[in-house]
Amino acid sequence: MGSRFSNKTIAIVDDDPDILQSIELAFRQEGATTKVAADGLGALHLVREGAPDLLVLDMMLPRSSGLLVLEKLQEERIELPVIMVTANQGKRHREFALGLGARAYLFKPVSLVRLLDTAESLLKGAAS
């Protein structure tokens, strides 16, 4: 069991249960506390109820897309590092997500090693 995310709460949102489970397991094995949701409204609830240290957010979600979640967080002035994860290779979507506050944009299928390394880097940047 790793510990690079001990004392960190990671919110993970994806509508694919297999992806959600694998990402959650990867963060837990590195010591994180995790909260999960399968849609955009669930993502907003997770963030509002307990301010996670980091949000891993799928773009294409039922009941409010990942982009709409980012817009809502921006409207509510809720700031936290967000990693957008998507199968959408469109450059405009990437630029839009980054413009709405996503700090990283990773394409599916995402390497769990790359995801964890990106999360670690963002959290270190947020702490300094």
Regions found by a protein language model. Give the residues of each.
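Alpha4 helix (beta4-alpha4-beta5 surface) of REC/receiver domains from two-component response regulators
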Residues: L68, Q89-A104, D117
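A Lys-centered signature of the CheY-like receiver
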Residues: K108
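Two-component/phosphorelay signaling modules centered on CheY-like receiver
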Residues: P17-K35
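The feature encodes the CheY-like receiver
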Residues: L20, P62, G90
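Non-catalytic signal-transmission and effector/linker regions of two-component phosphorelay proteins
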Residues: M1-A11, V113-S128
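Active-site beta3 strand of CheY-like receiver
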Residues: G50-V56, L61
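Acidic catalytic/metal-coordinating carboxylates
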Residues: D39-G42, S65-L68
